[in-house]
Each structure stands twice: as C-alpha cells, then as structure tokens.
From Swiss-Prot:
<feature type="modified residue" description="Phosphoserine">
    <location>
        <position position="135"/>
    </location>
</feature>
<dbReference type="GO" id="GO:0070064">
    <property type="term" value="F:proline-rich region binding"/>
</dbReference>
<keyword id="KW-0804">Transcription</keyword>
<dbReference type="Pfam" id="PF00397">
    <property type="entry name" value="WW"/>
</dbReference>
<comment type="subunit">
    <text>Component of a complex, at least composed of APBB1, RASD1/DEXRAS1 and APP. Interacts (via PID domain 2) with APP (with the intracellular domain of the amyloid-beta precursor protein). Interacts (via PID domain 2) with RASD1/DEXRAS1; impairs the transcription activation activity. Interacts (via PID domain 1) with KAT5/TIP60. Interacts (via the WW domain) with the proline-rich region of APBB1IP. Interacts with TSHZ1 and TSHZ2. Interacts (via the WW domain) with histone H2AX (when phosphorylated on 'Tyr-142') and the proline-rich region of ENAH. Interacts with MAPK8.</text>
</comment>
<keyword id="KW-0966">Cell projection</keyword>
<dbReference type="GO" id="GO:0010976">
    <property type="term" value="P:positive regulation of neuron projection development"/>
</dbReference>
<keyword id="KW-0156">Chromatin regulator</keyword>
<comment type="function">
    <text>Transcription coregulator that can have both coactivator and corepressor functions. Adapter protein that forms a transcriptionally active complex with the gamma-secretase-derived amyloid precursor protein (APP) intracellular domain. Plays a central role in the response to DNA damage by translocating to the nucleus and inducing apoptosis. May act by specifically recognizing and binding histone H2AX phosphorylated on 'Tyr-142' (H2AXY142ph) at double-strand breaks (DSBs), recruiting other pro-apoptosis factors such as MAPK8/JNK1.</text>
</comment>
<dbReference type="GO" id="GO:0098793">
    <property type="term" value="C:presynapse"/>
</dbReference>
<dbReference type="GO" id="GO:1902807">
    <property type="term" value="P:negative regulation of cell cycle G1/S phase transition"/>
</dbReference>
<feature type="modified residue" description="Phosphoserine; by PKC">
    <location>
        <position position="460"/>
    </location>
</feature>
<dbReference type="GO" id="GO:0030198">
    <property type="term" value="P:extracellular matrix organization"/>
</dbReference>
<dbReference type="GO" id="GO:0005737">
    <property type="term" value="C:cytoplasm"/>
</dbReference>
<dbReference type="InterPro" id="IPR006020">
    <property type="entry name" value="PTB/PI_dom"/>
</dbReference>
<dbReference type="GO" id="GO:0030182">
    <property type="term" value="P:neuron differentiation"/>
</dbReference>
<feature type="region of interest" description="Disordered">
    <location>
        <begin position="140"/>
        <end position="257"/>
    </location>
</feature>
Length: 711
C-alpha cells in the first residue's frame, strides 16, 4: 500500500482525542540544506523541549519518563543538526556510512526531501500524543483531506526518485557490519486502524525508530544467508525487496516428507532435502530422478566407515556399528527415496501373497538363511585397495559407484547376476549362494572362507546396500559385488560374522586334535589320563651288565668296613651260579636294577638317598648303601666284569650331579632353615671312597704286570 507523505491536521486532532491544534514554526516544504545552513544554525536558538520546537507551548508538561525520552530525541536532533546530517537518519550509523555521507557534497533538492520531512512530522505528532495521553497512537488513513491528497500525489511522484536512493543505500548496507539498524526509508502504515504498541526499547532511540525500522540482523538465518541457486549472485537476505529471491521462494508443504523444502528460483522449482543437501526436480514422494537430472551435485556424502575386526585367516570382517551420522537420516521416511533411479521398483516378486506362501518353503531348513536381494553389479579391485586402512574406503566407493550408476539395471553390461531381477542370497553351511526365487536355479556359489572383505553401506540411504570382495575363479580377479537388499543389510553381515566365528572355532579344535594325535602312543600307555605335560628333558642313561649279588641290611650308612663285611659274607655263602645276571641303569636321578632275561625290576634306588659307595677288596666287586627309612639302611652288591671301575665312576657322577641340583634348588627357596653342608666335604668323601677303591684295584693289578715283565 502506498505510504502517505503527510497527515491531515484533522486526523492528528482526532488521534489526539480533542487536544489543541499543532503548528510548526518552520516551513515543511523548504529545502533541507536551507534549514541546516551554517549561518542559520549559528543564529538559531535551540528550543528548550520538543513541544516548543513543534509549536505546542500550551501543552502541559509530560511525565518524567516521557520528558526523558523527549530530551533524548532532542539531543539526537541537535547532534544531527550540528554534524550537518539528515535528522531522519539513525544516530548509530557506522563510521563508514558517515564518511560516505560526508563525501556527498551535492545538495539534495527540496523535492527529494519532502518525504523525509513528512516522516519527521509524523514522528513529532506521535511523540506529542504519547506524552499527552500515555496511550498508543491510532492513525486513520481513510479520511484524508484535500491537503493530504495533494501531498500524497507528490509523495507518489517522489517514490520513483527514492527507489534509486534505496538501491544505493542497500549497497552501503551490504558493506556495513551486521547488527546495525538500517536507515529509515519507508514508513508503511496499514490501510485500516492499527494500534502501534511500544515494546521494550532503549530510551536513547529517536522517534524515527518507532515506525518501520528494520534490523539487518533479524535472525541468524538472515545474517548468514546464502542463495542455493546455481546462477544467483545475490548474497542478501530473502526479506529484502530487491533480493534475488521472492518472498515465496521457500515453501514447506504438508504433503512433503519431513526435512524436504520446495525452492523456487530462476532455474525453476525443485526440492531440497535440508539434512543431506540433496536436490531433485521431482517431488520426493514420486519416483526419484537420476543424478543427471538434479540441479546440483550432492553437497556432502557422509562415510563413517566399517569397524575392522579380526576375521578368519583368508579375509577380513567389518562389523556394523551404530552410526554417528544418525541425524543425517532425519526426515527420510524411506531410505531409498531420492537415491536410485530404480528405487520405486518393488524388490519383492508379485504377487505378494504368493511371496508369503513361498517363505516357509525357503526357510524350511533352519540351517539356511535367506535374504531377498538384487544384484547391482561388480567393480574390479586391486590388492593395494584391500590394504588395512584403505579397504573400507575402496568398498564404499564401489557401493556409491554402483548405486548411482546411470545404466539400466537390465543392461547386461552392468555385470549383475539375474539381469537386475530379484534374487535370494542364501547362507548355507559355509557357502554364500545366489538363487533365482522362481525355479530355485543356482546362479553363483561363493565359499565364505574365500571372501576377503564384506561391509554395509553407511551413507544416508545406503543402509540396504551390501558388498563383498572375493577373487574370481576363472580370471583370478578381485571383484567387489554389490547388492541392494530388501531388509537392512546389517542382517547379512551379522549372519556372516556368526558363520565365521563358528568356522574359526572348528579350526582351532581341529588343530588341537591333530596336535594330540601326532604324539607317540607308546609313550602314553602308562598315563592314566591324557594330560598335556611339559616335555621332559632327555637324560643320559648308562647301562652296565653285571651279576646282582643281592642286598643286605647294614647298621651304618657309611664306611668301607661296612661294605667289605657285607661283600665277604655274601661271597662266602653263595656260588657263582646263584648270582642273578642283571643290567644296572645309571641315571642322574635313579639307579635301576633289571633282570637280564625278564626285564623285571629287581631294585630301584633314588640317587638322593645314596649315602655311601665303594669298591671291595676284589676289583670285581662294587657296593653302595641306601637309606631305606629312618635308621634303616641297605647295601646293594654287584659283581662286575672285567672290573667295577666304570660302574663306580658312573654312580659317582650321578651323585655329584644330583647333589648340585639340590644345592641350586635350596638356594632359590627361603623356606628351608637347615644349613647346607659344604660341597667340598661331600665331594671329598665320595671321591675319597672311589679313589680308595680304584687304588686297591690298581694295587691288585700292579704285581701281575711286574711279574709278566720279569724274564
């Protein structure tokens, strides 16, 4: 609606509820520069208050609050007049605007300032009425007098000149900081009576701020507004009248899904999905267009990646984790909307009742898991793309490429099984199978252990895309096969994960079983329970062929006389035929006496309990004393051929080694409180006994050698 350039005196009197008539001491139609001339300003007398300046001396004094408000307005007018500025301008303009205003030296014509003085007149009347009655001003613009009609006609002529001024001022507003109010250019008054309420404002604002003042920072959306059109150079707010956008450029209809907006610009009307930034020509409720028909590319493709976990030996596994990009899916009722050119096609075969009848037959075997899928094709991959840290990005690129491809699904060059028709993906035992649902024809069988990588699409609208990478049997080429699933693809990934866990468990059990069967059964005969023991060390065992003379109890654990007495008693009481041919096995821990023919154990003695050993008076005799119990000792006697030197040395070495082990074990434990006997004493005692026996042996042999050498 056109704005009146001035208001009639009768309308002002009607609004002031019968108050006194207002008169102005200065001409309203005079030139602005004439009123603001430096000479006139020097000789002019500033009125004391706003009412005296407006010619209302008879009006009673207003209240304290109104007086303060009027005083602030008066100060602003005085500062504006002193600075030679437009009094209808807001005093809070930036320094850049002040500099641009001072640079304009050409005076404005009186015709260009008529509208500004009319606004000042309107502001003054409103301020006077507010101070008198303390109520809101009601302006009736219906009944205009002849004076108002003339001024209105003049104002309409002036609007053409003001349009050019508004364009210049808008360019200044673009360069000025946000948050500063724009200058008053137009006062818009409704056609009917309207109450202009005074909200909470600062008292320092002038009266011109009460009408039509626009804030350039009205909202966060306007302050950072950027046009979405490809060819639009405008950076202004959509509220600007000269902006590239019209007021109805953005529409959110109730028939659109949540998150969608209808946008209108010079390129036409298209639909914008706010969370993802995707745009399309067709409404989102209809069949989605291909990417080539979209006015602009997707602004962002979100990829959160797959969780790389330990898989089986021949491949990797990605576990589907909760996506952090969940807010990006807001507003998409159907994840397939606005994504694929074939999304409107049904993935279930027709008719539906027949499909439901076939489901029990498909899942008749509980060990088989079926999933309705559609092959999107395959993409060749390299070993470098499957490297750790790069495989997830490579597979996601394959999913994007095959999901957005522009070729027809029925194109045989797409490389998909079933020529783009519905298929059944079956997980049976350890095999992934692709079966035609109609005649149950097997199209492809892939061993699960040969799958290198599999994953689920994580982009917005890609929750039903499943892909796996395996090597082709014929070409030995790595191929990434992508499928569009009827249900969320994470169900397939979970099932594959369970199968892989089962395969790994079976392999571990089989490996343990093979390791157990590889053992020598002859060594496990005497073991009551098959338990894994540490592998024993192979100890050196020496065997000697002797005659076992038997064992007799003795009174003392040590002494050569004890051994000689036992040997003499046995030799005198028995003959050679009564002696038992035997084998003596000498080990570092045990001395074992076995029968030569029957291999029966005649005696087994622990080396740790051996107390004394010696060679008898006859070099063929050897004996040692063992502790059979507390204060109980036994002497074992042998007849050796050709002599007892080798057997005595072997038993002595076993005693030395065993005693050294006992010393090492006692030094590591602190529980024992008994002092360890010196090693020299034991070694000296055993060595002295053996040395004495050897000396006696050599002494018996020496006379024979000397006698043999004499002629």
């Amino acid at each position: 609606m056109s704005v009146p350039s001035s208001l009639s005196q009768s309308a002002i009197n009607a609004n002031s509820h019968g108050g006194p008539a207002l008169s102005f001491p200065f001409p309203l139609h005079a030139a602005h520069n004439q009123l603001l001339n430096a000479k006139l300003q020097a000789t002019a007398v500033v009125p004391k208050d706003l009412r005296s300046a407006m010619g209302e001396g008879s009006v009673p004094e207003p209240g304290p609050a109104n007086a303060k408000w009027l005083k602030e307005g008066q100060n602003q007018l005085r500062r504006a007049a002193t600075a030679h500025r437009d009094q209808n301008r807001n005093v809070t303009l930036t320094l850049a605007e002040e500099a641009s205003q001072e640079a304009e030296t050409a005076p404005l014509g009186p015709k260009g300032l008529m509208h500004l003085y009319s606004e000042l007149e309107l502001s003054a009347h409103n301020a006077a009425n507010r101070g008198l009655h303390g109520s809101a001003l009601i302006i009736n613009t219906q009944g205009l007098g002849p004076d108002e009609g003339e001024e209105k006609a003049a104002g309409e002529v002036e609007e053409e000149d003001e349009d050019e001024e508004e364009e210049d001022e808008e360019e200044e507003d673009l360069s000025s900081p946000q948050g500063l109010p724009e200058p008053l250019e137009n006062v818009e008054v409704p056609s009917g009576p309207q109450v202009l309420t005074d909200g909470p404002r600062e008292h320092s604002k002038s009266a011109s701020l009460l009408f039509g003042m626009r804030n350039s920072a009205a909202s966060d959306e306007d302050s950072s507004w950027a046009t979405l059109s490809q060819g639009s150079p405008s950076y202004g707010s959509p509220e600007d009248t000269d902006s590239f956008w019209n007021p109805n450029a953005f529409e959110t209809d109730s028939d659109l899904p949540a998150g969608w907006m209808r946008v209108q610009d010079t390129s036409g009307t298209y639909y914008w999905h706010i969370p993802t930034g995707t745009t399309q020509w067709e409404p989102p409720g209809r069949a989605s267009p291909s990417q080539g028909n979209s006015p602009q590319e997707e602004s962002q493709l979100t990829w959160t990646g797959f969780a790389h976990q330990e898989g089986f030996e021949e491949g990797e596994f990605w576990k589907d984790e909760p996506s952090e990009e969940a807010p990006m899916e807001l507003g998409l009722k159907d994840p397939e909307e606005g994504t694929l050119p074939f999304s409107a096609q049904s993935l279930s075969p027709e008719p539906v009742p027949q499909e439901e009848e076939n489901l029990p037959q498909r899942n008749a075997n509980p060990g088989i898991k079926c999933f309705a899928v559609r092959s999107l094709g395959w993409v060749e991959m390299t070993e470098e793309e499957l490297a750790p840290g790069r495989s997830s990005v490579a597979v996601n690129n394959c999913i994007r490429q095959l999901s957005y491809h522009k070729n027809n699904l029925h194109d045989p060059m797409s490389g998909g099984w079933g020529e783009g028709k519905d298929l059944l993906l079956q997980l049976e035992d350890e095999t992934l199978k692709l079966v035609e649902p109609q005649n149950q024809t097997l199209l492809h069988a892939q061993p699960i252990v040969s799958i290198r990588v599999w994953g689920v699409g994580r982009d917005s609208g890609r929750e039903r895309d499943f892909a796996y990478v395996a090597r082709d049997k014929l070409t030995q080429m790595l191929k990434c096969h992508v499928f569009r699933c009827e249900a969320p693809a994470k169900n397939i990934a979970t099932s594959l994960h369970e199968i892989c866990s089962k395969i790994m468990s079976e392999r571990r059990n089989a490996r343990c079983l093979v390791n157990g069967l590889s053992l020598d059964h002859s060594k496990l005969v005497d073991v009551p329970f098959q338990v894994e023991f540490p592998a024993p060390k192979n100890e050196l065992v020496q065997k000697f062929q002797v005659y076992y003379l038997g064992n007799v109890p003795v009174a003392k654990p040590v002494g050569v006389d004890v051994i000689n007495g036992a040997l003499e008693s046995v030799l005198s009481s028995s003959s050679r035929e009564q002696w038992t041919p035997s084998h003596v096995s000498v080990a570092p821990a045990t001395l074992t006496i076995l029968h030569q023919q029957t291999e029966a154990v005649l005696g087994e003695c622990r080396v740790r309990f051996l107390s004394f050993l010696a060679v008898g008076r006859d070099v063929h005799t050897f004996a040692f004393i063992m502790a059979a119990g507390p204060a109980s000792f036994c002497c074992h006697m042998f007849w050796c051929e050709p002599n007892a030197a080798s057997l005595s040395e072997a038993v002595q070495a076993a005693c030395m080694l065993r005693y050294q082990k006992c010393l090492d074990a006692r030094s590591q434990t602190s529980t024992s409180c008994l002092p360890a006997p010196p090693a020299e004493s034991v070694a000296r005692r055993v060595g002295w006994t053996v040395r004495r026996g050897v000396q006696s042996l050599w002494g018996s042999l020496k006379p024979k050698r000397l006698g043999s050498q004499t002629p």
